Amino acid sequence: MAYPFQLGLQDATSPIMEELLHFHDHTLMIVFLISSLVLYIISLMLTTKLTHTSTMDAQEVETVWTILPAIILILIALPSLRILYMMDEINNPSLTVKTMGHQWYWSYEYTDYEDLNFDSYMIPTQELKPGELRLLEVDNRVVLPMEMTIRMLISSEDVLHSWAVPSLGLKTDAIPGRLNQTTLMAMRPGLYYGQCSEICGSNHSFMPIVLEMVPLSYFETWSALMV
């Protein structure tokens, strides 16, 4: 999860987030090289007295500044399209969970179980225990098995919301009357925090998300107790 004064992204917990981190570094390096070239050209223009006032035609230069940006865009687009395809691909999920956004809490339903559903509210600051995080803890965590493909069905009962967990690389809009879906797979156990990422009213900041990723045996025990 994030920590104070953090400059980079959160540590990747899912394969998708790892790909997004690699793509971020790839794109950032391209931006750095372009910026360095532009600054170098500007410094030359400011420090040299050479001018080309008689230049009327420069087809070679025009060819370079047409082809080079096209190549750069291709180098950015290809890995981006690959990741977009991976994010939309859903192959035989092991578990399906439906989440509904409300003003201002989340409700969850495990559709593979007959009667496993609950609401998840933020714990008020005055009720927090030592070590718990302000504005991020909930009364009911979403317990999920790790190292398994899980499909999330996301919608809303009232206004626009957005279900987001940064360390898993997830952000999906919750739209009234529309059912969106996304997949997640956590590679290690732990607690993963997120929040509503669409301004949805006065208590928008009080809609945290907490995923508790556990081994399959623990999940089976928990689900049996909940049902």
From Swiss-Prot:
InterPro entries referenced in this protein's UniProt entry, alphabetically: CcO_II, CcO_II-like_C, CcO_II_C, Copper_CuA, Cupredoxin, Cyt_c_oxidase_su2, Cyt_c_oxidase_su2_TM_dom, Cyt_c_oxidase_su2_TM_sf
Keywords on record: Copper, Electron transport, Magnesium, Membrane, Metal-binding, Mitochondrion, Mitochondrion inner membrane, Phosphoprotein, Respiratory chain, Translocase, Transmembrane, Transmembrane helix, Transport
Binding site for Mg(2+): E198
Side of membrane Mitochondrial intermembrane, spans: 1-14, 88-227
Localization, UniProt: Mitochondrion inner membrane
Pfam families referenced in this protein's UniProt entry, alphabetically: COX2, COX2_TM
Protein name: Cytochrome c oxidase subunit 2
Species for this entry: Canis lupus familiaris
Phylogenetic placement of the source organism: Eukaryota, Metazoa, Chordata, Craniata, Vertebrata
Underlying gene: MT-CO2
